Structure formats: structure tokens, C-alpha cells
Amino acid sequence: SKPDDKLLILEDTNSDGKADKQINFADDLHIPIGFEIAHDGVYVSQSGSLVFLQDTDGDDKYDQREVLLSGFDDHDTHHAISSFCADPSGAIIMSEGIFLHSHVETAFGPQRGSNGGFFRYDPRTRRLLRHAQFTIPNPWGVAVDAYGQELFLHTSGTSMSWMLPGMVKARYGANLKAPDLLKTNKVRPTSGIEFVSSRHFPDEVQGDILINNNIGYLGAKQHKVIDQDPGFTTEYRQDLFVSKDLNFRPTDLEFAPDGSLYVVDWQNALIGHMQHNARDPNRDHKHGRIYRVTYPSRPLVQPAKIHG
């Protein structure tokens, strides 16, 4: 059968906090586990390639597909480039998990990755760099603070680390260390990470880090990030939300232009590719949820007018 994975636009047309309109931006994709929005389209992972889907006529559906780069390893698909995150310069950080060996030919020369780490793609120059090299299982979560410092999740374990030490160009095969910044109240596995940067949320929590957990704890932990030479440490602040629904699987979270927080719930009874048969009928391929978190005692932010 033909690929039919989708990128959907969910729109709240009457500003009541609930989506009431759905548009299929793309409906012919194959496992798009990482994407980042551009002003005229979307950068998305497609098998072993980074692809740009461009909307040329403004109808919220892509018209042109351009393969920007190929050669990313995808033989173990859930480790392939994913969890895209734009840094302050507009470059896209792309995560890659263990067991993969990527060799990407670019106009600036080949870029290689082995056994986990991060690539950085600059859309303006079309330059790809091996951004950081770590042996990490599933880095399903990258967040960038107000100063451009990047933190990332290890996912299979409980750890969260600072990315900068892995940017050192080490000798081939060297296993650079990624010290864990979380001291207490950490649960595995993790998926989805975000810095609090919203005038809708209280002043005292700005700069905190939010971390989703989806098996050992069904919710999100909130930690204060503290500067500590030569990097950072953290201090547990609170559980931001938790669910009694055993199928609640928060996998991503991001702040919206109005200051509210959106949380993606995979909503699945089964999780993991080793524990259950891939064709187990209890795997839910059709349902998911998106929650919107607000802070009632503070007003929402008036979004900036981008177009029109």
C-alpha cells in the first residue's frame, strides 16, 4: 500500500480553546517522526531523507516536495532523525538514536553520525553539521533556552543532559559523556521536553524545564534549571500534570503564540516494540489527543499578527 501518514493542521476558528477545523497539509508521508514549520512549508523526516514540503499558493496544503538531503540511516526507524527543534538562528536540530550509522553527502562535504547524536541543518545556507556526538538510545526531546543552550533527553533512561560537551570534536570512536542534570523526581521513559517561556505562566517559573513521562509516571515533571559551573544543575519544582488514565502517553509539548501549553497524548494501551507483537490488535493506530494547559489567573497573550 502507498504511504498515508499525515501532517494535520488543527485550527481553533472561534478562539474557544478547542480545535474545530482540520486540514490535511500532507497525506502521503512515511513515518514523519520529526518536523519543523517554515514560513512557506514544513521540513520533515522521510525515511532516510530530510524533505521540504512547500505550500506555494497558501491553501495550507503542500504543492511541491524537495528532497534536501539523503543518507540518514533508517534501518531502525524509531531511532531515525526525529524530534526536530529550531534554535534561535532558525537552524534545525535533528536527533538520531543508537545503532544507526548515517553518511550524508552535502555540497560542503560528507557528514557522518554513528551510534546516536544530533545533526544541525541551516535552511539559509543548506549546510548540515554533525552538531553533537553521544552514544544515546532515543533522544526524543530537545529544548533550547533563551541563550541558545540546548538540553536533551535520553528517553530510555531517566536522564537529561546539556548538549554542549558533545560538540567537542573527539577522536573517532570516542564515547563522549553526557552527565545527567536531573537530581530527584525522575522517571523513565521520557519523551518531549520544553522550557517555560510564556508570559501567560507565572514569572517565577520562567526558564523551568518540563519533561514528559509516559510509563513509570503518566504526566510531566517540572524542574528549575540553575546555572552551575561548568554547566547546569536542576531542582525539582512540581508535577505539572498527571493522569489516572493508564493509556495516557504524553510524547511532546510546546507553547503556543497565546502563551498556552499544548501537550500531545499518543493515547495507546501498548508501548514499546520489544514487549508486544507489532501486529497486536491492542495497538491503537487511529486515536490520539492534544491537551491545552492554561494558567487561569493570568491573561492569555495576544498573538503577534504574522500575516494578513
Where do the protein language model's features map onto the residues?
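Beta-propeller domains with acidic blade repeats across secreted/periplasmic ectodomains
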Residues: 1-308
